[in-house]
Amino acid sequence: MKYGFWLPIFGGWLRNVEDEQMPPTFDYAKQVIQSAEKWGFDTTLIAELYLNDIKGPEQDSLEAWSTAAALAAVTEKIEIMTAVRPGFHNPAVTAKMAANIDHISNGRFTLNVVSAWWEEEARQYGGIFTEHDERYERTLEFLDVLKGLWTQETFSYDGKFYQIREAKLAPKPVQKPNPVLYAGGESERGKQVISAACDAYVMHGGTVEEIERKINDMKQRRQATGQAPFAAFGMAAYVICRATDEEAQEELARITDVKESSGYAGYQDFINKSQLETQIQLRDYSVSNRGLRPNLVGTPEHIAKTILAYEKAGIDLLLLQFSPQLEEMERFAKEVMPLVESLREASHSLS
């Protein structure tokens, strides 16, 4: 199991808690990622939104790609997975930027490809936001251009959305043939595009049974393309680790006390502009990315056993959220991660 975390670029993950003591500043982000390296985390995921989806559109947030480049220069081991939304980017310029950050990081830069869901944000920032399936058609062409520029000495492309004429990109990325392309999606068209064009599949939080079904489905879809298996299956989850179940449940009740909040500004766009497999309740939206559904809430032993259940279902990358970030990441690294290893070893010795 690889342990990843979402970089706190929005000032937290809780829509019902105003101040989580984790400011959306570069200094705090740098402190978090450098500490995470010391504690044994493998990956960080930097979301790309120009408006703050957690605390409200009027609140501060960090821009993803400039933050990724800066953090690449002050870290040594951790994978820096950064979201990219084709409706906001020129693919040739994106290919160049990604190759550059891959060199800054010495091969640690990866992409999370997102076809976008927030129409109001696109309106404010001049992004291209068309009907659902067309967004995925654009994504497919976008990925064609990235891969072509990363792998061919001279590249031309004549598509519906993008035209490239004898373009050269040098230097190529450190990673061959390309930086890993992660993506998540639940619609039929989304799963088709991801199976055909991406390297790894990431999911919002879900129960073990939900996640196992999704993994099996995507494995079959990938096999049907004739390509190598997906490099990873990842899942988002929010962690509440406490000494007792009672303490953990008290914290859960506190953060899911739904209030009127500007942090819910994107809720209707998220459920209406996406094609979701799971019905989302307002309580689920209290925490980002359906993070409560995996139920990593309780004692270290409960959380460790639950992680092993997801590992058995096929998850090999967790993308975790914590609040407050530094304190809870350290607790997880010291109390949960070693316990997962010892429980796994004990299970193997019994078998």
Q: What kind of region is each of these model predictions?
A:
Residues 55-81, 138-142, 334-347:
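Alpha-helix-loop-beta-strand connector modules within alpha/beta enzyme cores
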Residues 1-74, 158, 174-179:
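N-terminal beta1-alpha1-beta2 module of alpha/beta enzyme domains
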Residues 3-5, 44-46, 79-84, 109-113, ...:
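Hydrophobic faces of well-ordered beta-strands that scaffold small-molecule active sites
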Residues 3, 36, 40, 71, ...:
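Conserved, mostly hydrophobic/aromatic
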Residues 7-9, 38, 125, 132-174, ...:
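An alpha-helical appendage that flanks or caps ligand/catalytic pockets
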Residues 37-38, 68-76, 98, 102-109, ...:
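Acidic (Asp/Glu)-rich catalytic clusters
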